[in-house]
Amino acid sequence: MLQDLFTPSVQHALDIVGIFVFAISGALLAVRKNFDVFGIAVLAEVTALGGGLFRDLVIGAVPPAAFTDLGYFITPLFAAALVFFLHPEVERTQLAVNVFDAAGLGLFCVAGTTKAYDYGLGLTASAALGLMTAVGGGVLRDIVANEVPSLVRWDRDLYAVPAIVGATMVALCIRYEALTAFTSGLAVVTTFVLRLLALRYHWRAPRAWNRRSTAVEAEAQETP
């Protein structure tokens, strides 16, 4: 299905862009955690390729694309080298990194959903794998770096929700036979914009409601 929407060269270019920006985020975290050069390279690879590897193993697309296309493997290493030598400059362009990361999130959730459907999965499972393609690398990155995955932390701006929206849009388009290059692009843009808005306005998922803490806060506000 994805092959019907974009030429192979366009698909490959979009994959490389997404892999590169995700690798940058992994390499930056490695620098902040004082990893050595090998650790920076490993974290860049894990972040960039983890979600896609998980998807391909689940749907039976073996060997995974990351092992059959040298460009997929080399791109994270290039990103790691860039961060290793120029990380102060890269840190100063964090806004640009966030923008590209949001774009990668949109691209990967759409590509992951369509590829899973192409391999015979149902719409719900395809959307779930689209989500995992988009966020799986980040989860593995945080685990390797010995951190609680930012995906499940309340003090992090929404990340999974934009990907869920994008993957759901693709699944609905498939269901109603409306998946085109335009609607796929719309899903990417929607995911991209939602992620940037979450960063701009610090949108976060709600936590479990605690009656006792709510009552204490209300009492404190009433106390003169």
Predicted regions and their residues:
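The first (N-terminal) embedded transmembrane alpha-helix
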Residues: 12-25, 43-46, 165-166
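Small-residue-rich segments of transmembrane alpha-helices in multi-pass membrane proteins
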Residues: 44-52, 101-114, 132, 157-171, ...
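Helix-coil boundary and interhelical linker segments in multi-pass alpha-helical membrane proteins
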Residues: 1-10, 57-67, 111-126, 171-183
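Cytoplasmic-side transmembrane-helix entry/capping segments in multi-pass membrane proteins
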Residues: 38-46, 68-74, 94-105, 129, ...
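Intrinsically disordered, low-complexity non-transmembrane regions of multi-pass membrane transporters
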Residues: 1-7, 203-224
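C-terminal ends of transmembrane helices
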Residues: 23-33, 56, 81-94, 139-151, ...
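Structural signature of hydrophobic alpha-helical transmembrane segments
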Residues: 7-19, 64-78, 122-135
